[in-house]
Amino acid sequence: MTHRFLEACRKQPVDRLPVWMMRQAGRYQPSYRAVRANVGFLELCRSPELIAQVTVAPIDEFGFDAAILFSDILVHLPAMGLDLSFEKGEKGKGDGGPKIANPVRTRADVDALKVPAPKKDLPYVLDGVRAIRAALRDRVPLIGFVGGPFTVASYAVEGGSQGFTRLKTMLYAEPRTAHALFEKLTQAAIVQIEEQIAAGAQAAQIFESWLGELDRADLEEFAFPYLARIAEAVKRTGVPSIFFSTGTTAHLEPISKLGYDVVSVDWRIPIDEARRRAPGVAIQGNMDSTVLLGPKEVAVERALSIVRAAGREPGYIFNLGHGIQPGTPTETVKAVVDAVHAFAWK
């Protein structure tokens, strides 16, 4: 079966624009909140049955053109030797941010990290992928994902605190330690995404959310080489690859040459400019998720303005510039999806 999302990833013509949204399974959904009323976040991430339930729900509720595996970019850290937990939020069930009790601070800490073996250490993720594929019945494709090395390192080194001071200091004070850490995290990302694809994921997104913290020189030394290796690993599997980051539009040209099929951009760049500056890749994005918190009519018009600006050329996927925020009205999400699907050039 041909899927318009996968065709758009490969810059092929589609019958209508594909749309999905980051965090399309999340706290804005009553169905998700009902699940979370009974289980903690990590408990949810470790239940294949619940992973499938919350992953498939947005497809049924909103008609998205792709599902994305429900998991977390840090779910593998315990297998690497780090003590991961999620702070208690308002509901007391781990809705808050991640905390790492034994953060990575020294070369000895890096050397002690183990590269996970997903079949042994993360079977619930792979079983979740298989359960999702069975539940979807090929209605839409499934996107697997991992976190990028810098973003995962920011949590592993900082321990959950806000900011990037310790990690960025490591780049300058102990560059060999930083490279050793990024090497371990790159290996971890590659084995995870390869196993997700082997289990049935039909595309792969790399979330390098905090890459905008780095300048060009640091990107070229500490980020781009590792990200290119992940892209090459995905390419060997034959499924499309998507790169996501925020705050990096100044570096769009080199990012578009890392080897990914799709580059997902945030709202800080006009979508037509992104397409001009990165002609070799498909573009995904890029509505500010905060727009969805405003009037429904405003969100629909903003979405359509982005679609028009993206132009007629194949290789465009409508998405947000970041994840859907808690409190977003579900009727607004549905209205935007329907409007993008109904759009046609006159």
UniProtKB/Swiss-Prot annotation:
Pathway the protein acts in: Porphyrin-containing compound metabolism; protoporphyrin-IX biosynthesis; coproporphyrinogen-III from 5-aminolevulinate: step 4/4
Family annotation (Pfam families): URO-D
Residue(s) at site: Transition state stabilizer: D72
Designated gene of the protein: hemE
The UniProt record lists the keyword Transferase: no
Protein known as: Uroporphyrinogen decarboxylase
Reactions performed catalytically: uroporphyrinogen III + 4 H(+) = coproporphyrinogen III + 4 CO2
Transmembrane stretches, start-end: none
Keywords carried by this UniProt record: Cytoplasm, Decarboxylase, Lyase, Porphyrin biosynthesis
A single BP term in Gene Ontology: protoporphyrinogen IX biosynthetic process
PANTHER family in alphabetical order: METHYLTETRAHYDROFOLATE:HOMOCYSTEINE METHYLTRANSFERASE RELATED, UROPORPHYRINOGEN DECARBOXYLASE
Binding site for substrate: R23, Q24, A25, G26, R27, D72, Y155, S209, H322
Enzyme class: lyase
Signal peptide: none
Subunit structure: Homodimer.
GO cellular component: cytosol
EC number: 4.1.1.37
Family statement: Belongs to the uroporphyrinogen decarboxylase family.
Keyword Disulfide bond: no
MF GO annotations: uroporphyrinogen decarboxylase activity
